């Protein structure tokens, strides 16, 4: 690309109803435009209205093995069943990290790891080393607190206690009321 970006996390187009073929065509156009790209698919039906199937992901990886390199699974329908060589599967929540690792996932991609990264890293490292899991429950508890609210508003509220900059949000987002 002219801007030298080559690695992307890309969600399918939102709003309109479409099927696997339209989604495959969408990613095909991107790859044709930027053949050197590496794409992590973003599976988040709640946000875009489309949920990847195992079959669709398999077709994309077969067609573009050098470009479609992983999936962030925030719909949680892939991380237990999708197994492909040289392909990373990453659930979108800390609460799925340990189970995901046990099933062969590569890790997680999650907004709240901005807060939980040290705990998530310990769970990951302890899993790889075969150590007892001493912080996984705490990690999941923190994630569960954020899930009670709008996640992004919760993150801004958390960070605004240290830096007023994080109070700057645009509607419909806002910081959480402390009461």
Where are these regions (language model features)?
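Alpha-helix N-cap and loop-to-helix initiation/capping positions
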Residues: 18-26, 52, 56
